């Protein structure tokens, strides 16, 4: 999983720090820049500086300051907005099923109210999933098990099995959807409040999701990707806050910083870092690394604002990622799904090289993003499995200061978040067993199927593959029909080329949209 800075580079087309292994030449051609600026939500942040020396320092990270806990300072996991899906990946013609913090929800477009709605994904009749239904000709959400229909407030409007001259059974409260959640759209994302109590009906008026203006700024270009990963929220969040894994877990894919050859201690170029972590309280914390300021806004947002300045250079490395006088923003929405599974929505924006995104298809940029996800996916899954019965603070040896943000997150989680996500008896904390590597590295169900760009590209490339196979057969038939040797040889050559092209394309489709895998030993 990429640290914020690396994702900035992973989606860049021309920055010198971006690298790809030679076997990924296609990706190398289409890398796409990312990201913008954010208004800092907190002022007057008290920072304690970590002078981090990753390779050699043998002392533990300095403890960030923690504000003394007040009785009301416990974090409530269900008193917050949660991102459900990016609007660009939702189809208004059908309902969409998602699971967030253990809650199964259905997201659908109510054309009467011109708004996205989020319901509990359960029909009150026989508990069938509404997300498997359809939007009927009157714009109602229809359960396809028995045809019951619901409006935008969850009221039942039609029960086909009810007699015309009988009692209006559809007006009963028991016929209504049990969970109708407050929802809104902000920064191009559909959000929901995970409590259907009527007292929260107008919660948006007093409590809005965290807003990042740059993502809606027309002077910035913005790219997004959503990926479900086979490890939990805690592992996902701490990995995004860890810059020191980038040269190793993502070697050959990208570089976090440009390290001087004279300063390299190994091939990958791990080096000392300077990280500052601010005061930790129930509202999260801030940190500074090189020329970027980062903010953790519980429970889901971790974002960074990158603005080059004189402090960009360190004695061992430089960070020429963003042009002078320009700004880039990287935003991560970390969404708990179930124990052992989480979802990441990444949004990157920048106010330079904005024309590139207009010419590079979105699915091309997702190729490099997905490769980054894959490169440390297995490491993080196994790490979580090993930590499931252990105390993180006692089991992990943290001798250097490069892990400052990771330690800060774990301290926040322990002090304010109850040590883990509150699943409210929906799940036990036990993790699911480890599936096969092929299932772990699945791209289709974890991304392609729910991505509007990649799903369309996958269908079109599959059609092209079939077309190439058909062309191969046509050329064979033409070769058999002609008598001129030169023409026959040409037809045979075209048949062979078409067949080989179809085989190559089949391999490309499989690795890009279905399953890629990753082997660090030969990178």
Curated annotation (Swiss-Prot):
Cofactor(s) named in the record: [2Fe-2S] cluster
UniProt-annotated location(s): Plastid, Chloroplast membrane; Cytoplasm
Binding site for [2Fe-2S] cluster: 123, 125, 143, 146
Positions that bind Fe cation: 245, 250
Catalysed reaction, written as an equation: salvigenin + 2 reduced [2Fe-2S]-[ferredoxin] + O2 + 2 H(+) = 8-hydroxysalvigenin + 2 oxidized [2Fe-2S]-[ferredoxin] + H2O
A single GO molecular function term of this UniProt record: metal ion binding
Rieske domain mapped to chain residues: 81-192
Record site feature (Plays a role in the stabilization of the metal coordination), residues: 239
InterPro entries: Cholesterol_7-desaturase, PaO, Rieske_2Fe-2S, Rieske_2Fe-2S_sf
Lipid bilayer topology: Multi-pass membrane protein
Pfam families: PaO (PF08417), Rieske (PF00355)
Role description: Rieske-type, PAO-family oxygenase involved in the biosynthesis of polymethoxylated flavonoids natural products such as nevadensin and salvigenin, aroma compounds which contribute to the flavor of sweet basil, and exhibit pharmacological activities such as anti-allergic, anti-oxidant, antibacterial, anti-proliferative, and anti-inflammatory effects. Catalyzes the 8-hydroxylation of salvigenin (SALV) to produce 8-hydroxysalvigenin (8-OH-SALV). Can also use cirsimaritin (CIRM) as substrate with low efficiency.
Name of the protein: Flavonoid 8-hydroxylase 1, chloroplastic
Organism per entry: Ocimum basilicum
């Amino acid at each position: 999983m990429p640290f914020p800075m690396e994702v900035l580079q992973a989606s860049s087309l021309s920055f010198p720090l971006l690298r790809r292994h030679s076997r990924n030449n296609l990706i190398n051609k289409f890398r796409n820049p990312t990201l913008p600026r954010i208004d800092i939500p907190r002022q007057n942040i008290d920072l304690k500086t970590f002078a981090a020396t990753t390779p050699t320092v043998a002392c533990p990270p300095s403890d960030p300051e923690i504000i003394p806990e007040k009785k009301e300072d416990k974090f409530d996991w269900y008193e917050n907005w949660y991102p459900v899906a990016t609007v660009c990946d939702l189809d208004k013609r059908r309902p969409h099923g998602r699971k967030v913090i253990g809650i199964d929800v259905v997201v659908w477009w109510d054309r009467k109210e011109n708004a996205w709605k989020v319901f509990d994904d359960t029909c009150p009749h026989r508990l069938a999933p509404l997300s498997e239904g359809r939007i009927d000709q009157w714009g109602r959400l229809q359960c396809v098990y028995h045809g019951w229909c619901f409006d935008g407030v969850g009221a039942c409007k039609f029960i086909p099995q009810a007699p015309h001259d009988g009692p209006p059974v559809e007006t009963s409260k028991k016929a209504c959807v049990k969970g109708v959640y407050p929802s809104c759209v902000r920064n191009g994302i559909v959000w929901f409040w995970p409590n259907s109590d009527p007292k929260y009906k107008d919660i948006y008026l007093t409590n809005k999701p965290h807003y990042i203006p740059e993502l809606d700024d027309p002077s910035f270009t913005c790219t997004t990707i959503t990926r479900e990963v086979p490890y939990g929220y805690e592992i996902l969040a701490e990995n995004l806050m860890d810059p020191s894994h980038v040269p190793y877990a993502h070697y050959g894919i990208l570089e976090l910083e440009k390290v001087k050859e004279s300063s390299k201690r190994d091939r990958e170029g791990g080096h000392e870092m300077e990280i500052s972590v601010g005061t930790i309280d129930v509202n999260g914390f801030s940190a500074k690394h090189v020329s970027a300021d980062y903010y953790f806004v519980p429970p889901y947002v971790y974002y960074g604002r990158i603005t080059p300045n004189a402090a960009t250079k360190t004695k061992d490395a430089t960070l020429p990622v963003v042009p002078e006088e320009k700004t880039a923003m990287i935003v991560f929405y970390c969404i708990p799904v179930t124990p052992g599974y989480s979802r990441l929505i990444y949004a990157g924006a920048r106010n330079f090289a904005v024309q590139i995104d207009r010419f590079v298809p979105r699915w091309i940029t997702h190729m490099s993003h997905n490769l980054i996800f894959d490169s440390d996916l297995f490491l993080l899954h196994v790490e979580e499995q090993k930590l499931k019965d252990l105390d993180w603070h006692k089991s992990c040896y943290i001798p250097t200061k490069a892990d400052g943000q990771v330690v800060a997150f774990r301290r926040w989680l322990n002090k304010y978040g109850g040590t883990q996500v509150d699943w409210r008896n929906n799940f036990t904390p036990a993790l699911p067993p480890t599936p096969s590597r092929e299932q772990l590295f699945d791209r289709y169900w974890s991304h392609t199927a729910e991505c509007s760009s990649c799903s369309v590209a996958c269908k079109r490339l599959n059609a092209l593959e079939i077309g190439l196979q058909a062309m191969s057969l046509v050329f064979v038939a033409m070769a058999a029909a002609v008598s001129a040797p030169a023409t026959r040889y040409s037809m045979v050559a075209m048949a062979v080329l078409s067949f080989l092209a179809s085989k190559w394309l089949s391999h490309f489709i499989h690795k890009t949209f279905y399953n890629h895998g990753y082997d660090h030993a030969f990178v």
